[in-house]
Amino acid sequence: MAPITSFIRWAGGKSWLVPYVAQLTEGLDYNNYYEPFMGGASIFFSLDLPNKGCLSDINDELINAFCAVRDNPERVIRYLKEYETDEESYYVIRATEPKGKYQRAARFLYLNANSFNGLYRVNRNGKYNVPYGHKNATVNYTRLLEAGKKLEGMEIVCHDFSDISTKIVAGDLIFLDPPYTVSKEDTGFVGYNSTWFSLDDQHRLAKLIDQIKKAGAYYIMTNAAHETILEIFKDKGRMVTLERNSLIGGKKAYRGKVPEYIFTNIPERSTK
C-alpha cells in the first residue's frame, strides 16, 4: 500500500525523518518490517512495505488503539462521533475508563486530538493528566480508514523492545526510535506509561543491534546527539547527524533546531 500519514499526533514522532528514511531505503530489498518503539508509527506509514511485520510498544492504550483501528476502524469512528469537543466534555471523557476495546480506542484518539500539544501522559497511578488544548479538534476519519487498511496483516503487540530478537531473520528491516537517555542521572522518563528508559536500556538496545546485524537484517536507529550515545553505539554502524524542529513543549524557549544521531547498517550505496 502507498505511503500515508499517521492518524495520531505523538511527542517525539518521526514524521520529520520520513524523507531521509525514504532516501536511505530506496532500492533496498528487505523482507519484514519491525518498529519496537512504535509511537505514532510515522515511518511505518510512510513506507510501501513489500511484506508484513510487527509494530510494538510498551504503552498498552496505544497498542489497543492501533489494534482497534486495524480490526474495525468504522466501529472506532462510531464511538468517536458520540464525543463533544468542548472543554467541559473533554474533562468528563478524560475521567472515564471504558473497558471495551473500541471504546478505549475512541477515548484514546479523542484525548490525543483534543489534549494540549497532542501529548499522551499519565501519572504514576496510571491516570491520564494532560489538560485540554484544542477547541473543536477532531480526528481525521479518512486518515483513520486509510490506516486501518495499511495495518491489515500487521502484528501489533505490547511488549519490551528486545522481544523482537527471536523473530528477526535475514533481510528484515528494523526501525528503532528509543526514548532519549544520556546518563544515569538524566534517566528518560517515559511519561506516557509511567516507566523509565534508563542508560542500561540503551546498552540493551546496543545488544539488540548486535543481534540484528548477526541475523543479516537491516536497522535504522534515531537517538540523542550526545557523547554518551556515540560511545555506546560507535561500532554499530555508520552515523549521521540531522537536525529537527522541536515542536513539543510548553515554553517557546525550548522550541528550535535540535540535532539527533541516526545510526544504520544499510550500505551507503543504497542512498543517493
Where are the language model's segments positioned?
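Conserved acidic-Pro-Pro-aromatic motif
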Residues: 170-176, 180-262
